[in-house]
Amino acid sequence: MIIRSPESEVKIVVDRDPVKTSFEEWAKPGHFSRTIAKGPDTTTWIWNLHADAHDFDSHTSDLEEISRKVFSAHFGQLSIIFLWLSGMYFHGARFSNYEAWLSDPTHIGPSAQVVWPIVGQEILNGDVGGGFRGIQITSGFFQLWRASGITNELQLYCTAIGALVFAGLMLFAGWFHYHKAAPKLSWFQDVESMLNHHLAGLLGLGSLSWAGHQVHVSLPINQFLDAGVDPKEIPLPHEFILNRDLLAQLYPSFAEGATPLFTLNWSKYAEFLTFRGGLDPTTGGLWLTDIVHHHLAIAILFLIAGHMYRTNWGIGHSLKDILEAHKGPFTGQGHKGLYEILTTSWHAQLSLNLAMLGSLTIVVAHHMYSMPPYPYLATDYGTQLSLFTHHMWIGGFLIVGAAAHAAIFMVRDYDPTTRYNDLLDRVLRHRDAIISHLNWACIFLGFHSFGLYIHNDTMSALGRPQDMFSDTAIQLQPIFAQWIQNTHALAPSATAPGAIASTSLTWGGADLVAVGGKVALLPIPLGTADFLVHHIHAFTIHVTVLILLKGVLFARSSRLIPDKANLGFRFPCDGPGRGGTCQVSAWDHVFLGLFWMYNAISVVIFHFSWKMQSDVWGSISDQGVVTHITGGNFAQSSITINGWLRDFLWAQASQVIQSYGSSLSAYGLFFLGAHFVWAFSLMFLFSGRGYWQELIESIVWAHNKLKVAPATQPRALSIVQGRAVGVTHYLLGGIATTWAFFLARIIAVG
């Protein structure tokens, strides 16, 4: 830390009324672009309108104006999020069986949607228990509401209305900070103030308020619920907050108030700030008292972190200094110049944020099942499968987005004249070594991982099981993963003596938590089958990275097209007369990367779905005998490609294929329709623009003959547009197909 004389004070400066509010202007399609605002000559106009509406770089080159538009758009995004949340809470209040579920979560399924009986649609409302007929939901909201201490539908109504108010507030803020008081560029570039406020405010106070809410509202209410008290008999939240004696009956240390805090006698609070580990056997979720403790600790860390950066007080870290001091022995100028990049290129900034958030989202997917945070979440298999799948897909998309914006930064914002011998320049200078090595790794992983499966399929077909790679023949045990599992399983007695159980039951040991005769979680064994599929994961991830990284590193130039930067972010080919230069733009790398991301995530969610049904989920008898949904067939079946096709895809598709005539029939229709959407994408991906242009021209001829030709000239989609439409339908169709397949299966058997 460097202490200096105070620099120029940070002032919050805004421009008053910079842009007039004009509904006339907004009503004109394409008002942000001179060419688009002229109106359509050809049908390409509508595509350009959509492509450029949010590409603020194309509206103006003024960084301040771009920053204001992005800032304003963020408020619009928040408004939509609040609106969506409000809708979720409103459905919980108006159409759900939340109160019934709350009184008996093990026998009643969550439902918050009842289908209107139009032309026989009442079949879709299945019996979820307790005499309620509706669609079983798998969003996890009920479990979250219970963990928050919500006990009746009125509270859900109030929250829904509150979220609507906030949605309106956000819309107003977006308008106000663009049209009435727009911040100056210096405000957007003041990273130290931004870090302090985001760390201390959003993360610090956010975590602290959640911890406070849990201590004063959630914990007491959940204690009553766990003890079987009728939700209507439980005191209301404000009674716990206002009446300390009420809390002291549940947690005696409350009688002493804040005295233990200020006298450093913190162990008094160990009643509700615990460090137990494992799961609560009543609910199958993490101990809520552990969660409170965690959020309190996080809050303190971030409140401290939010006071670390130098603003007007001449004390603390300066980010520019930190970055410029960051030099290694082989990295030349190191991070010098990175500060300027990240404060003038929002694409570079966004790219980093997307990469981090994408990785974090995938981490969330893995923690939601291994450390289920909410009561009765672990035994709701449909919700568990949905949460994992959802967070995996979202994480994959965000990471591809990171590569997309990194490439846009390279094309639009990177200035090669000022960047010399810093880290980025050095990476670009040895990009050939990076990409060729990565390519070799992909080839190695691909041939070896699939080679192991092909070997097994061949031996299986020839009737030689003793020569297969399996737990019962030639073993390929994941010894490093097992070592990590074992280390964590032993932690409570060794490195974490204060904990009663390890962080997750999945690590190992003898613990099993079951709620209402259903397994919540148990130690997950890893064997040869997992070793094989993990190498498929490694392969697909490396190929995705290869495609995306090649797109970023070769975004400005390559041996094939040295002047690529002049062609822009997306272009079909390097003009006529240069064959073999198609699919080289940075955009095309994102396009191709999306398919491999889809491959990678598909294998992950298939692995998860089958592994959990085979080795974790199931029922437990009074004698303690566990019967898994697919009877532990993963270890022996998933070691051949035929096993994946026969015992996973085909065997588990029976529920969605046979869903007609049952309350799951909607999933059967979605399964069919999504397959169609997926197949429709191939029409765009496997045909050239010229084919369609020829077809269109003969159709236009027919229109002219009949004198019904439109004024706007029809045009075939451009090559890039066709690919965009193709990949969108491919992903949408594929994801919706998987969704229908998973849910019909798990709701039927789980």
From Swiss-Prot:
NCBIfam families: psaA (TIGR01335)
Pfam families reported for this sequence: PsaA_PsaB (PF00223)
Membrane-topology annotation of the record: Multi-pass membrane protein
Transmembrane segments: 70-93, 156-179, 195-219, 291-309, 346-369, 385-411, 433-455, 531-549, 589-610, 664-686, 724-744
HAMAP family per the UniProt record, alphabetical: PSI_PsaA
UniProt-annotated binding residues for [4Fe-4S] cluster: 573, 582
A Gene Ontology term for the protein's cellular component: chloroplast thylakoid membrane
InterPro entries named among the record's database cross-references: PSI_PsaA (IPR006243), PSI_PsaA/B (IPR001280), PSI_PsaA/B_CS (IPR020586), PSI_PsaA/B_sf (IPR036408)
Binding site for phylloquinone: 692
Ligand binding (chlorophyll a): 683, 691
Enzyme's top EC category: oxidoreductase
Phylogenetic classification of the source organism: Eukaryota, Viridiplantae, Streptophyta, Embryophyta, Tracheophyta
Family statement drawn from the similarity comment of this UniProt entry: Belongs to the PsaA/PsaB family.
Residues that, per the record, bind chlorophyll a': 675
Official protein name in the record: Photosystem I P700 chlorophyll a apoprotein A1
Superkingdom as given in the UniProt entry: Eukaryota
Recorded catalytic activity of this chain's protein: reduced [plastocyanin] + hnu + oxidized [2Fe-2S]-[ferredoxin] = oxidized [plastocyanin] + reduced [2Fe-2S]-[ferredoxin]
EC number: 1.97.1.12
Assembly with partners or alone: The PsaA/B heterodimer binds the P700 chlorophyll special pair and subsequent electron acceptors. PSI consists of a core antenna complex that captures photons, and an electron transfer chain that converts photonic excitation into a charge separation. The eukaryotic PSI reaction center is composed of at least 11 subunits.
Gene3D superfamilies hit by this protein: Photosystem I PsaA/PsaB
Key words of the record: 4Fe-4S, Chlorophyll, Chloroplast, Chromophore, Electron transport, Iron, Iron-sulfur, Magnesium, Membrane, Metal-binding, Oxidoreductase, Photosynthesis, Photosystem I, Plastid, Thylakoid, Transmembrane, Transmembrane helix, Transport
Subcellular locations according to the entry: Plastid, Chloroplast thylakoid membrane
Signal peptide: none
GO molecular function: 4 iron, 4 sulfur cluster binding; chlorophyll binding; electron transfer activity; magnesium ion binding; oxidoreductase activity
Function: PsaA and PsaB bind P700, the primary electron donor of photosystem I (PSI), as well as the electron acceptors A0, A1 and FX. PSI is a plastocyanin-ferredoxin oxidoreductase, converting photonic excitation into a charge separation, which transfers an electron from the donor P700 chlorophyll pair to the spectroscopically characterized acceptors A0, A1, FX, FA and FB in turn. Oxidized P700 is reduced on the lumenal side of the thylakoid membrane by plastocyanin.
